[in-house]
A protein has these predicted regions:
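Sec-dependent N-terminal signal peptides
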Residues: 4-16
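A short beta-strand-turn-helix
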Residues: 18-33
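Typically the conserved alpha-helix immediately C-terminal to a functionally engaged Cys/Sec
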Residues: 46-61
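Structural microenvironment flanking redox-active thiols in thiol-disulfide oxidoreductases
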Residues: 72-81
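Structural micro-motif
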Residues: 82-91
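Non-catalytic, surface beta->alpha helical segment in thiol-disulfide oxidoreductase systems
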Residues: 92-120
């Protein structure tokens, strides 16, 4: 019984897992798309709160918006390129170009409002 519960929890968690970007896939993943990238660190408590909000937003977000994550400790070059110095930070990309950065925890309504104003 414990194994079944564990497997169910893993499958639910994987539904909400966002793909991690790195130097190898970064450009191809953001090119020609509306993208929100969550710059985070595993040691950052507010980043975990924002991740939960992003999971909630992912359920209601438009199909033309994709959410990715970048661990700042694993990807220092990308982090530096986009001037990320505070966490959590969301960078909104349109057609491969960074168009806006938001710092801090955002509610689902704020995420939705920001995406609508940027991508519509």
């Amino acid at each position: 019984m414990k194994k079944i519960v564990f497997i169910l929890l893993l499958s639910v968690a994987s539904v909400f897992a966002f793909e991690e970007l790195n130097m190898d896939n970064f450009e191809s993943k953001i090119k020609g798309k509306n993208v929100i990238i969550d710059f985070y660190a595993v040691w950052c408590p507010p980043c975990k709160v924002l991740n939960n909000k992003l999971e909630e937003y992912d359920i209601v977000k438009p199909d033309n918006v994709t959410i990715y994550k970048i661990n700042i400790d694993d990807q220092p070059l990308i982090t530096k390129k986009y001037g990320i110095t505070r966490l959590p930070s969301l960078v909104y990309f349109q057609d491969g170009k960074a168009v806006k950065t938001k710092i801090g925890i955002q509610s689902v309504n704020e995420l939705e409002s920001n995406a609508n104003s940027i991508f519509n």
